[in-house]
Amino acid sequence: MKIFLILFCTTLSVFADFAELVKSGDAQEAKFQYDEALKYYLPAEKLKPDDAALLVKISRQYALRMNDLPDKAGKTASGRKALSYAERAVALAPNQSDPHLAVAICLGKLTPFMGNREMVEASKQIKISAEKAVKLDPKNDYAWHLLGRWHQSLANIGGATRALAGIIYGRLPAASNETAVECFRKAIALNPDRLVHFVELGRTYGMMGREAEAKRYLERGLAMPDRERDDPETKQRGRASLKQLS
């Protein structure tokens, strides 16, 4: 009985320590302090290494800190680490939306540092992961956004990359700006406070030659306050697209 009580109290202590570490990490993440957040999340991982939700949080820190790193090597290393945590989360919780979304996000952030072949191969997995995330949680606005970005990207790739994509896919999967628009509109309906949905919808309309709609959504997104770490970079893309329309 005494041994049982000791084990019970020890277990309670571990859970309390874990919860406190995660809470502290969340507070740092809310301030965009990703390295500081990892100082709490990584010790929490040692207490509960099979907690998929925590692994998604860790993945997100490594993915977002890529923006703050000065060189390609550092960005790529951080992105790869983010991807490894996301893949672990998927293995532990294959029926949850967020781990699949994390894989899609990590691959999306890594694609600028890939060669054409690796980029096209990553694109295939992005689509699979984003579609899985949407299927598991149709109310996951960012999953719809990632699926929209996939359609937007593949619908507008250049000739050489398109030819390579055809070789890897065998036959290119259906992708269109129209489907991208549908995905971004769903994302906006689910979360109208995320400016990236508006900016990417506007950019897609611009790619379609629908300038009035492009300007309306780009200006709407650019007028919104920054709430997320990627928002300044998103606005840079939006301003560049708006300038091309002027």
Short names for language-model regions:
Residues 14-67:
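N-terminal leader/linker segments that initiate helical-solenoid repeat arrays
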Residues 195-233:
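C-terminal/domain-terminus segments
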Residues 28-36, 60-95, 102-139, 149-186, ...:
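Short coil/linker segments at helix-helix boundaries
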Residues 3-12:
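Sec-dependent N-terminal signal peptides
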Residues 48-50, 95, 139, 193:
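Short helix-capping/linker turns of helical repeat alpha-solenoids
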